Design a protein with these regions (language model features):
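N-terminal signal peptide c-region/cleavage motif recognized by signal peptidases
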Residues: 19-21
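Extracytoplasmic small-molecule ligand-binding "clamshell" domains
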Residues: 26-102, 242, 252, 261
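Periplasmic-binding protein-like
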Residues: 44, 120-127, 154-157, 208-277
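Ligand-binding cleft/hinge of the Venus flytrap
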Residues: 67-75, 154-177, 207-211
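Short helices/loops that flank or line small-molecule/ion binding pockets
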Residues: 80-81, 85-98, 111-113, 139-142, ...
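A ligand-binding cleft/hinge motif common to bilobed small-molecule-binding domains
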Residues: 86, 102-111, 157-161, 189, ...
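Flexible hinge/capping segments at coil-to-helix
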Residues: 129-146
Length: 277
């Protein structure tokens, strides 16, 4: 190889190295303590877990818990509002420190770590009164059109259930994905879909808010799952610190009180072995 070609080759390699993506694996707890704040990715369209009040303030069950946990760590909270579909990618990229209200799934556990659970979740089906749907039975949903939030556990659950229907020679449920729960409910009210599948506790809030709409809860679908906060896998110290703060809030009764306030009931939550196999 002559000198000119060598120079061109070396320069090309140098430019290639500069343009390669850089993956940062720093422990987020160090930055949280240094900056005096924890950056939280949140989609505040999921009442009663997280939503905005009439003044635009982010409120709900998880924001109250996050504020208390952050105070226990001696830091403030900075929210970064984004669509739910962008939250886990932001967490993995390291542009945020944590996110609340994630269904705990084996697939997500491969990509992120979980703080100990803050709640439990069971999905349900909601429809308009007077429609042909009477129950949440999968066979009854076969062939119907259902709205779900994109990239959520309910969407993944329904995709898995569609495989079951197909294996039995039955029609799949046609799934239409939306960014927010409000969009799924609007699609239902406008009769663009036959039903909506999402967390049961969210539907109680939705029915209360939309008293003018003839919404009816058809029943539960799928099993119970824990809900937890997510943290980047490169930050085990932050995960441990947040878990420690939640354990304090469980021990002094604060977590149970917040569950009663926002859900109207309490649930017993595991602290170990809570990721489904």
């Amino acid at each position: 190889m002559n000198l000119k070609l060598k120079t061109i080759f070396s320069f090309s390699v140098f430019i290639t190295i500069l343009t390669l993506p850089v993956y940062v694996n720093a422990e987020a707890l160090d930055d949280v303590k240094k900056n005096g704040k924890i950056i939280v990715a949140i989609d505040p369209t999921f009442a009663p877990f997280e939503y905005t009040d009439s003044t635009g303030k982010i409120v709900g069950y998880d924001p109250e818990l996050i504020e208390l946990a952050a105070a226990g760590m001696g830091v403030k909270v900075e929210y970064r509002v984004m669509a739910f579909s962008g939250i886990i990618p932001a967490l993995i990229a390291g542009s945020v420190d944590m996110t609340p209200t994630l269904n705990v799934t084996p697939e997500r556990a491969l990509r992120i770590d979980y703080v100990i659970p803050t709640a439990s979740s069971v999905n349900a089906v909601i429809a308009l009164k007077g429609t042909s749907l009477k129950t949440a039975a999968l066979d009854e949903l076969s062939g119907k059109t259902c709205a779900v939030k994109q990239t959520t556990q309910p969407e993944q659950m329904m995709k898995a259930m569609n495989e079951k229907l197909k294996s039995e020679g039955k029609k799949a449920v046609q799934l239409l994905g939306f960014e927010t729960i409000e969009q799924t409910l609007s699609a239902l009210v406008d009769k663009r879909v036959d039903c909506v599948v999402d967390d049961k506790s969210v539907f109680y809030e939705a029915i209360a808010k939309r008293k003018d709409a003839p919404l009816v809860l058809l029943g539960e679908i799928g099993g119970v799952q824990p809900i937890a906060w997510g943290v980047n896998k490169s930050s085990p110290k932050l995960t441990a610190a947040l878990s420690a703060e939640l354990k304090k809030l469980k021990a002094n009764g604060t977590l149970s009180n917040l569950q009663r306030k926002h859900f109207g009931f309490t649930s017993t939550l595991p602290e170990t072995d809570f990721v489904p196999k």
